[in-house]
Amino acid sequence: MTMLSVIEVLFALVLVGAGYWWISKKRYERKLKWIPKVPGHPIFGNVLDFAKTTDTLKVLSSYLKQCNGLCSVDLIVKKKIVISDLKLLELLLTSTNEFLNKSVEYKFLQRWLGDGLLTAKDERWRKSRKIITPAFHFYILRQFVSIYETNADTMIKLLEKEVGKDSVDIYTYVTLCTLDIICETSMGVKINAQTNGQSDYVFAVKEMCRITVDRGFSAMKRLDLLYALTKDYYKELRYVKTLHSYTESVIRARKKSLLSDHSKNDVQTEEKLKNVYGEELGAKKKMAFLDLLLQARLDGEPLPDLYIREEVDTLMFEGHDTTGAAISFALFCLAENLEVQAQAVEEQRTIFGKDSNRAVTFDDIQAMKYLELVIKETLRIYPSVPFYARNSVRDIEYKDGQIIPKGTSLVIYAYGVNNNPEIFPNPEKFDPMRFENMEKTSPFAYLPFSAGPRNCIGQKFAVHEMKAVISKVLRNFELLPAFPRHKPLLAAESVLKSANGIKVQLKPRKWD
C-alpha cells in the first residue's frame, strides 16, 4: 500500500468517525429538545459564564429562574442538565439503578480515592455501603464525643489569641479542627493539624482539594492528555503518594494491633457492640472507622488493604472540609443574628448549668434541639455541597414521552432548592424556627445531605460533630459581627466556601 493510500484510508476513517459522532450528537440533542436550553456562545456555549467559582451560584440560580427549575447547559465537551424541579429530583434521588452512578467529574478524585464510597459504581458501591453502614451505628457514634471535645478544646485555646480583634477568619481554625477530628475518628491517629498545620500529610490534603477543584473548572485540565502536561499533574502524583503512604502505614499498624487484641473479625451487630463497649462505650478501647473495616468481611474474606485504604481516604476527603465549612457558616450566622445566638446560649445554659467547662456528653448533644435547628437553617442557606451530579445509565422516560438519554449528566442544584422562596418564604432571612414544622414539606425540598440511596452516610456523625464544636465555642465566646461588616463571597468549589473568608469578632463569654 502506497503512502497516498494510507493517507486516504486514515482520512476516510476520520470522516466516518466524525460523521458517527455528529449523528450521535444530533440524535442525543433531539431526545433533549424538551428541556429548555440556556442561550450561549456559538462556539464556547455557556462555559464562559463559569470563569470564576464565585460566579457559579449566581449563574446557575439565574438559569433556573429563567427556565423554571430545569435547563440544559452547554459546556462544550458535555451538556449538563441542571435541576431544581422537585418532581425530577425525586425521580433522580430515589433511583436504585438508573441514576445511581456519579458523573464523570468524580473521576478527577480517582487517583486519590480509587473506588471508595464517593466514587464507586454499581455493585462495588452496593457492597461498600452495606459494609460501611455499621461504622455509623448509634453505639459507635457515642464514643466519638470525647474526640470532638478534646480537639475543640485545642481550637478554643488558639482562638483565645484572637479575642478583641476587629475580625477573625473563623474558617481557618475550624477546618484544621475538623481535620484533626476526622483523622482520629477514621484512623485512630492524632495528626495535630491545629498545632502542626505544615505537616506533609495536612499540606497534601489541602493541595489535593485545590487541584481537584481547579481541574473541574478548567477546560484544558479536564482532558487527561492536556492535564498530564501541567504542573498540577506532577504535584498530584507526589501528594497522592504522600497520602497513600500515610494511610497504608496506619492500616498496617492498626491491623497488627487488632490481631493481637481480637480473635474474631466480623462486622459488629448491635448486641455485640453493647457487649463489647457497654452502654456508654467509654470503658474500653475506642474503635476507629478503620478498625471496623479491618474486622469486616467481603464475600467471607477480610477486606483487601487497597479496599480499606480507598474507604478511609474517602472519609478523610468527605468528612473534614464539608463539616468545617458548615460549622464556620453557622458561627457566622450566629454572630450576625444575636437574638438567635442568645436563644442558642440559653439552651447551653440549661444543659450545662453553671459548669460551662464540663466535657460534653452524647446525651448533651442529643438535648441540643435548638442548636440543631440553627444547623439546619445554616445548611439551608449555605449547603456544604451546593450541587452534585449523577449519570443516567440508560434511556429513561420521565413523563409523556420525555426522554433522558443514556449518559446524560444531571446536576442536582441543592443550593437552588434550599433557597427556593416557594418552599422557604423570605429565604435570605436566617430563621431556625422554620424547621420546627417541616413534616408536610417534601423530603426533596431540603438537600443538605442529598437524599435517597446515595445520601450522605455520615450525616448523623457530621451533625453531632457540629453540635459539639459550636457548643464549645458558644460556651467560651460571644460572637459578634466582624468590623468592618463582613459579607461572605460564596465560591462553589469542592465544598461551598467563601473567597474572602468567614469572619466574626470574638469576646470572652461571661457564663455566671
How would you describe each model-predicted region?
Residues 2-127, 142, 146-158, 235, ...:
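N-terminal membrane-proximal hinge/A-helix region immediately C-terminal to the signal-anchor transmembrane segment
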Residues 48, 59, 137-139, 240-327, ...:
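Conserved cytochrome P450 catalytic core segment spanning the I/J/K helices
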Residues 178, 182, 187, 239-248, ...:
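Central I-helix of cytochrome P450 enzymes
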Residues 338-341, 459-497:
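Cytochrome P450 heme-binding "Cys pocket" and the immediately downstream C-terminal segment
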